[in-house]
Amino acid sequence: MSPPNQDAQEGRPDSPTAEVVDVRRGMFGVSGTGDTSGYGRLVRQVVLPGSSPRPYGGYFDDIVDRLAEALRHERVEFEDAVEKVVVYRDELTLHVRRDLLPRVAQRLRDEPELRFELCLGVSGVHYPHETGRELHAVYPLQSITHNRRLRLEVSAPDSDPHIPSLFAIYPTNDWHERETYDFFGIIFDGHPALTRIEMPDDWQGHPQRKDYPLGGIPVEYKGAQIPPPDERRGYN
């Protein structure tokens, strides 16, 4: 594969199309400590890469063109199904509308010129300050036939955390979707048995969300009461 076109690196975080979703202050996003190092004054933006321009470089253009053609046979326009195409760090990510995710995945798997027959699971991400798109599901795909890689990304709001399940297309996503539901609260519609897989069935909340409290128990040391971690300092 030839390297992606440098112009496509407009998808990088410092490009004009990049999206700032949060601003973190202090070292590791922690505030309220007795820091005297000066690192407590750090201010850092959390930035998501923006859309990349054509040509993307390498086999990326071929994937996008063939997927667009396959979707047209389904009477779906590529621009209606894919919100943006991002080339960042030599990787291709398609941000897909959640209601059209199964149709995009089906075409990626079944089209002879695409043949992304392997889905390596699904990962959840929580951006609490990205209003209306707080929850993200990320699917790494691999074409064993053509030795190509691709990533699909879908977003949903906290208020409506529903994303169509890909279990019928990639059955190996069974446990991965359960784990993402367990830890992030994303509801995969159509999954045959969407139950917790790591936490107890009666557990409250979803532990890998950014707004989930750290918890803990108070500790007594030499007569002093030390509160649980999430009450000692502020995390953003």
Swiss-Prot record:
NDH-1 is composed of 14 different subunits. Subunits NuoB, C, D, E, F, and G constitute the peripheral sector of the complex. It is a peripheral membrane protein. InterPro entries: NADH_DH_suC, NADH_quin_OxRdtase_su_C/D-like, NADH_UbQ_OxRdtase_30kDa_su. NDH-1 shuttles electrons from NADH, via FMN and iron-sulfur (Fe-S) centers, to quinones in the respiratory chain. The immediate electron acceptor for the enzyme in this species is believed to be a menaquinone. Couples the redox reaction to proton translocation (for every two electrons transferred, four hydrogen ions are translocated across the cytoplasmic membrane), and thus conserves the redox energy in a proton gradient. It is found in: Cell membrane. It holds the Pfam family Complex1_30kDa. Its main location: membrane. Gene3D superfamilies: NADH:ubiquinone oxidoreductase, 30kDa subunit. Its EC number is 7.1.1.-. It comes from Mycobacterium tuberculosis (strain ATCC 25618 / H37Rv). It is an enzyme of class 7 (translocase). Keywords: Cell membrane, Membrane, NAD, Quinone, Translocase, Transport. It catalyses: a quinone + NADH + 5 H(+)(in) = a quinol + NAD(+) + 4 H(+)(out). Residues 1-20 are annotated as: Disordered. Belongs to the complex I 30 kDa subunit family. GO terms for molecular function: NADH dehydrogenase (ubiquinone) activity; NADH:ubiquinone reductase (non-electrogenic) activity; quinone binding. The lineage of its organism: Bacteria, Bacillati, Actinomycetota, Actinomycetes, Mycobacteriales. The gene is nuoC. This is NADH-quinone oxidoreductase subunit C. GO terms for cellular component: cytosol; plasma membrane.
